Amino acid sequence: MPYIECHIAAGLTKVRKTQLIRDIVKVTHESIGSDPKIINVLLFEHPADNMSISGRIHGDEAPR
């Protein structure tokens, strides 16, 4: 019974989150063969200003 955590920036629509979850379930099923009915996906949404890429706050030009 796989549990997959996915941390994302807040703001995706319910439709996009649903598609993301479906894609994660599909890839997990294809990769390890688990029955899609037992694959669990947990989405964690974070404010963009709490996320960093390469040492820069998401959306900022200068490092913090």
Model segments located where?
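A domain-level signal for the structural core that forms small-molecule/cofactor-binding pockets
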Residues: 2-64
